[in-house]
Regions:
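Short C-terminal boundary/hinge segments that cap the last helix of small helical domains
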Residues: 127-146
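Short alpha-helical "recognition helix" segments of helix-turn-helix
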Residues: 85-95, 102
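Alpha-helix N-cap/N′ positions at the starts of helices
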Residues: 8-12, 69, 85, 97, ...
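Recognition helix of helix-turn-helix/homeodomain-like DNA-binding domains
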Residues: 98-112
Length: 146
């Protein structure tokens, strides 16, 4: 079992897996979460066992238990932009994230995924911003959306 696994971090609708004999069970976040499910949760969102059997060892729903490095906030990048480029950067970020998520991600209220980090860095570089670090902070967590 994974040490220091906190089931309270598991999203409510995150699909769990009951396949004990799966070759990837020891590193699958879905299986690990199932092992740590609290007794007071009577019904759990669980993958259909027949689907697992039909897959013959291949699982399309495998979710690695490796933690992912998420970025928090990119005000550092936004502040490094010239006045002329700031609006272009903002418009491109809003078209990518959406207006609400742009402001939440900019200030660090929403995590920025690795793919989103690459996009932010590429746009900043296109606009002439070169920094050692483009984000305000980082956090390592399980990627429940993988």
């Amino acid at each position: 079992m994974t040490p220091h696994f906190d089931y309270s971090e598991v999203p409510y609708s995150f699909g769990l897996c009951a396949a004990e004999n799966c070759p990837k069970a020891s590193t699958c976040l879905r299986r690990i979460a199932m092992q740590y499910a609290p007794v007071n949760r009577i019904f759990l969102p669980t993958m259909n066992p027949n689907r697992i059997i039909a897959g013959k060892g291949k699982c399309d729903y495998y979710c690695s238990n490796e933690k992912t490095r998420f970025a928090l906030g990119f005000t550092r990048t936004a502040n490094a932009l010239t006045v002329r480029m700031a609006s272009t950067f903002r418009y491109r970020m809003i078209s990518y994230f959406g207006r609400k998520n742009y402001y939440l991600k900019r200030r660090g209220a929403l995590k920025i995924t690795p793919a989103e980090q690459i996009y932010v860095i590429n746009v900043a570089k296109e606009l002439g911003v070169v920094l050692n670090d483009y984000f305000d902070g980082y956090i390592e967590e399980y990627n429940w959306n993988a």
